Amino acid sequence: TFTVSLARVMKELSLKPIYMPEDPESVLISSMDVNRPGLELNRFYDYYDTSRILIFGNAETAFLRSRDPEDRFEILEAIFSKHPPAAIIARGIQPSEELLTAVTNNGVPLLGTGETTSSLVAALVAFMNTELAPRITRHGVLVEVYGEGILLVGDSGVGKSETAIELIKRGRRLIADD
C-alpha cells in the first residue's frame, strides 16, 4: 500500500495550516477518497472511514452553526476522536471554537483554503488518485514500431536490449530501456 505525506498534499493544493500538532511529513495518508461528513454530523458512524481526509464546506459549516455550542462540540468531538488523518476547511471559512477545540483535543491537523469545496474535492481526489495509484515495476524495453508502442519484457539476460537494437537498425525508435 502506498502513502502520501500531508506535507505533499499541503504543498500540491496550497493548503494553509490552521492547527498542526506534528510535522506534516510524518502524517501519512493511505486513502484516495475524501469524506464530507454529512452523516457523521448527524451521529451516524456505521460507514465512517477514518482513513479519509475530512472536508468541511458551506453545507457542513451551516449545519454546525444551526446547533447550539454544546451539541456542536459533542458532534465534532465524536468525529475527531476517531482520528482522521486531517481536516480541511474550504472557502476561507473561519473555524468555530468548538472545531478548534475538537481537533486540538484529538491531535488532528486542520488546514484551510480559499478554494470552493467542489474544486478542493476534485483537486484532492485527482492528486490522491495519482499519488496512490497501484504500480508495478518491470524490466523491459519500450520501442515504437509503425507508430505503436511495444514493451518487450522478460527475465534479465534474455535479449530484450539486443532485440531493440535490431529494431533500431531497421529504422524503429527506442523509447526507453530499463
Label each PLM-derived region with a short phrase.
Residues 1-80:
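Gly/Thr-rich phosphate-binding loop signature of adenosyl cofactor/nucleotide-binding cores
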Residues 52-55, 85-88, 108-111, 149-151, ...:
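Structural motif
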Residues 57-59, 91-92, 114, 146-148, ...:
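Fold-independent oxyanion-binding glycine-rich loops
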Residues 71-72, 136, 160:
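Amphipathic coiled-coil/heptad-repeat helices and related helical stalk/stem segments
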Residues 78, 102, 166-167:
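Hydrophobic/aromatic ligand-binding patch that stacks against planar heteroaromatic rings
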Residues 83-86, 92-127:
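Charged, amphipathic alpha-helical linker segments immediately N-terminal to NTP-binding catalytic cores
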Residues 127-147:
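P-loop NTPase nucleotide-binding/switch module
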Residues 147-175:
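Glycine-rich phosphate-binding P-loop
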